[in-house]
Amino acid sequence: MAARHHAFILAGTGSGCGKTTVTLGLLRLLQKRALRVQPFKVGPDYLDTGWHTAICGVASRNLDSFMLPPPVLNALFCEQMRQADIAVIEGVMGLYDGYGVDPNYCSTAAMAKQLGCPVILLVDGKAVSTSLAATVMGFQHFDPTLNLAGVIVNRVTSDAHYQLLKNAIEHYCSLPVLGYVPPCDGVALPERHLGLITARESLVNQQSWHDFAATLEQTVDVDALLSLSVLSALPAGMWPERPDNTAGAGLTLALADDEAFNFYYPDNIDLLERAGVNIVRFSPLHDRALPDCQMIWLGGGYPELYAADLAANTVMLKHLRAAHQRGVAIYAECGGLMYLGSTLEDSGGEIHQMANIIPGHSKMGKRLTRFGYCEAQAMQPTLLAAPGEIVRGHEFHYSDFIPETPAVMACRKVRDGRVLQEWTGGWQTGNTFASYLHVHFAQRPEMLQHWLAAARRVL
């Protein structure tokens, strides 16, 4: 298989149809066949990629067409495929659900066409028979240019029921039905308000996933799946100018990585390492000292769940404040912003003292405060952007940050050509910048260049 590349996108009819669970089972099943799998996720989600990584031991990558120009995204995809036999790409929401009403903008279908990958549609077979063929036919004819190559039916309780569904779909849609997935309670993924619980928090029962893969081996035609997933060619991609491997020479980045902070795109870490930055991981929860460093990155996560323990580690908070006062270039996203604030009020109303580097108070709410993609334009010099430069990213948080200083970014949400919302966000204090925005550095080479330049000022 090494001479040919294989890839497919597992798409769904909507959220909650079982894409993640079935993706994980297929990853494990393909590994059982001694194939080098590379998992991907369409869109910005961290949780699904974390589960991919935990199940197959290979860092899953995000394919986000809002943040990344097509040539860059394609280049990232091809880079990971160099050492892989097959890419298993989990779609986002329903097959044609994108950012707005255009099914060719930020949707799973658009990604399939951009990468030249066939689509396998996952449909729910519970309590339905021939009507399921009508559902498949609707997806099939909605965009005839899409390579909808096959179907897998989820939640099928018997072979007799499966044969009824298979015959109907193949008769009316002329699409191969590759198999079915029986109910498997042992691999149900735990959830909470932000969606799935992270694989890191959950004690992943590898035996359950091994058993699930063994079940799929009996109910899914893997040979047919592999036959349908052969790529004629990898997509054409091109990198913009990247910092060379001397740009970060001599710089050390302390990367927060524990139960409270662990939302990072592996591509971002790769870019820093390729620039020559030495990355040392540390735990704001458990460690008593910071690594010797010129840069600190506090990513997203769930600091609200560990607020008492974070507040109790006063030695770490003291070291963070000292690093800020020395001018260490500190960057924080979402949960990292909450940690750098003055106080954090958890969902129970208890207030915890945080680092007090970005003056302000974080308060957890019961509903999403902000969700989705946005553009942020720097109104003054920041760690990642010069005045006027635009950064694209996404927000997803139940907390609200009440600042005591003015924001430095003008943010807006534009969908279907209309500005839906405008607000300000992002706070710069000294050489520290924090915001709710999660970003992908590959979108603009200048982002890393700004951060590295700021870090060099403290060498």
Swiss-Prot record:
Gene Ontology biological process: cobalamin biosynthetic process
InterPro entries referenced in this protein's UniProt entry, alphabetically: CbiA/CobB_synth, Class_I_gatase-like, CobQ/CobB/MinD/ParA_Nub-bd_dom, GATase_3, P-loop_NTPase
Highest taxon above the source species: Bacteria
Variation of activity with pH: The catalytic activity is essentially constant between pH 6.8 and 8.0.
Keyword annotations: ATP-binding, Cobalamin biosynthesis, Glutamine amidotransferase, Ligase, Magnesium, Nucleotide-binding
Record-annotated active site: 334 (nucleophile)
Domain GATase cobBQ-type: 252-446
Catalyzed reactions per annotation: cob(II)yrinate + 2 L-glutamine + 2 ATP + 2 H2O = cob(II)yrinate a,c diamide + 2 L-glutamate + 2 ADP + 2 phosphate + 2 H(+)
Site (Increases nucleophilicity of active site Cys): 438
Subunit structure: Monomer.
Comment block on domains: Comprises of two domains. The C-terminal domain contains the binding site for glutamine and catalyzes the hydrolysis of this substrate to glutamate and ammonia. The N-terminal domain is anticipated to bind ATP and cobyrinate and catalyzes the ultimate synthesis of the diamide product. The ammonia produced via the glutaminase domain is probably translocated to the adjacent domain via a molecular tunnel, where it reacts with an activated intermediate.
Note: The a and c carboxylates of cobyrinate are activated for nucleophilic attack via formation of a phosphorylated intermediate by ATP. CbiA catalyzes first the amidation of the c-carboxylate, and then that of the a-carboxylate.
Name under which the protein is recorded: Cobyrinate a,c-diamide synthase
Organism: Salmonella typhimurium (strain LT2 / SGSC1412 / ATCC 700720)
